[in-house]
Amino acid sequence: MKTMEDLFLDSVADMYYAEKQLVKALPKMAKAATDDDLHSAFESHLAETEGHMRKLEDVFAAFGQNPKSKKCRAILGIIDEAEEIISDNKKSPTINAALIFAGQKAEHYEIASYGGLRDWARGLGKAQAASVLDEILDEEKAADSKLTELAETCCNIGAKAGVVVGT
């Protein structure tokens, strides 16, 4: 990268790709969930994720750029693990706990990425872009908190007890 702005835009392209991939993965995770609340959480986050793509388009626009995608190996690895979890845990009491674990891996990656991008946008003097990235960051943190709540109140308990929740 030649400049900080180049690094920033390259990283935004990485996250734009990541969000596109999550739009494809979240319906599979929702379908695999046997707990109604977890199913709903994945569906709600799908709508937010589609919104994140639009918000990232606004970030590109703030820099006078058209949206671009750059292959994000990190999210592809996380999604591959999620698909493996679904395959290995179908009809198992652990399916919902495993899906939460996979979902939180994605959320934590996004939280780290959007926090860094927000800080870079501030440093580049792009307050509007920083504000948009902060909105996305808040939504990712809320999604992570929802998954934690579901894990602690039912899904991990069901997995430990050997009960398939919701079936």
Task: Give the location of each predicted region.
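Amphipathic alpha-helical hairpins
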Residues: 1-167
